Amino acid sequence: MPIPVNKPKNAFEGVGAGQTATARIGVGMRIHNLMIPYSGATLAQIKEIRVIANGQAIQRLIGADVIDAVNQFDGRNAANGIIVIDFERFGVTLRGPREITCLDTTKNPKIRNVITTVSVEVDIDGAATNPVLGTPQAKESAMVKEPSELMKFNRVFGYDPQGSGEFQIA
């Protein structure tokens, strides 16, 4: 199996307080995770991150602080200037299951729904003083024999506990 390597991607466009920054991610490889360097804004001031493939949001993540909390729960270090968005199952020790759950943008003829475009949108709060998003890095690997058609799909399910009784958070 090919060894994953970190590759820089296109820089963000439209970075500013109260703006939506966009970066286009190249296709043709299997993307394991995406690392976004940031400064000039707190994690709470990075309001929403969307990963868009073929014009459809495949991951909609509310707040970099939530991403950081999930990453710490999974065993990663706290985001110290770098936000990590996982496409593969982090913590899986076997290479096969990790490979099958990553974002596959290869041109494998066995894949029914080929991903032709990938981009990342980041909403920055207007209270951020001088936000800077560095060039994102992607951990990628080349195509292997079997296609990866499983995808980690993060969605937000809104729930307002204010008017309800007791509830359990799991």
Which positions does each model-derived feature cover?
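Beta-strand-centric surfaces of beta-sandwich/beta-rich domains
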Residues: 1-170
